């Protein structure tokens, strides 16, 4: 009988390194490792690939998914102005369905019996991975070694040392950190006390606003049908634009987020995020929509944006409702073309100008000077008709009093 096979989402860290040996030992399965680059620039993917093989993986894939992540995952979320609980721009939550998609793809190519991830049993990511896999291939079984073994950090290190698995050397980072192209998240350690101020060592992409430059910096972001296409007049692909905007806004302390969020699994968790580009691009996109979307479309879209964020946060990227919302949002972006000017200063991003060839803002109708072309006399009839239901209701109530 052929040996079973498992495709593991591999990061190169201790958890997933131990998981390679643990899956082989407990499931008698060959392990295929898959490392996905979603914009964590500090990772040497070739080193990670070789490390997986040295530990015992029969194959080790690395995949540069930055472009796919930017255009197929970040962009739809940006166009939806999705921000979970009005604070979190969904960085880690966005990468999980992409990694799950690639896991399923490799598993199908390899004829694998399982896929596996390195998530704990306490967080949202286990849900995001497993629900995404179920949506894409309901016949694939998902293994969660870290959730199954339930070891302490010390027990995990003991297992690694016993089986010759490399253990990180040096002072252990007190925080749990996740990085991708869209943002950096930080939790655990002192951050578990919601009263404690986040220390500066929790931040890496942004300067403390008090130490930011004493002069503001202005950036101009160009959009075509809701897609950011230029920064300060220079045409850029989305990956490069996001990376540059991180650097520019980060040096002004923009994009720091301290959030106690409601996790899907039922607990509240305190996270610190750094998302400079996400903060600026979402602000700019919203501002461009204010002048390019008709009122009814704009208001209806505003009502959907929080639901979209919840679907993504909760791991329902491949859900039919989310896909239906994508179709609506794509249609809404047809006229979202133009340029937005944003001022960056001491931790704040403030829109100071917006222009579009499709602008619905009419100076002649909005002005109060002599160029005013608004028909003031028409207001009386409009008010009478608009207020008629209220007037009728009030009259009936008064007659019954």
Curated annotation (Swiss-Prot):
Q: Which UniProt keywords apply?
A: Amino-acid biosynthesis, Arginine biosynthesis, ATP-binding, Cytoplasm, Ligase, Nucleotide-binding
Residues binding L-citrulline are 88, 124, 128, 176, 185, 261, 273
Matching SUPFAM superfamilies: Adenine nucleotide alpha hydrolases-like, Argininosuccinate synthetase, C-terminal domain
Pfam families given for it? Arginosuc_syn_C (PF20979), Arginosuc_synth (PF00764)
Q: Where does ATP bind?
A: 9-17, 118
What are its GO biological-process terms?
Answer: argininosuccinate metabolic process; L-arginine biosynthetic process; urea cycle
So where does L-aspartate get bound? 120, 124-125
Q: Which GO terms describe its molecular function?
A: argininosuccinate synthase activity; ATP binding
Q: What is its EC number?
A: 6.3.4.5
Query: In which pathway does this enzyme or protein participate?
Result: Amino-acid biosynthesis; L-arginine biosynthesis; L-arginine from L-ornithine and carbamoyl phosphate: step 2/3
Q: How does it assemble?
A: Homotetramer.
The entry's family comment says:
Belongs to the argininosuccinate synthase family. Type 1 subfamily.
Name of this protein: Argininosuccinate synthase
Source species? Symbiobacterium thermophilum (strain DSM 24528 / JCM 14929 / IAM 14863 / T)
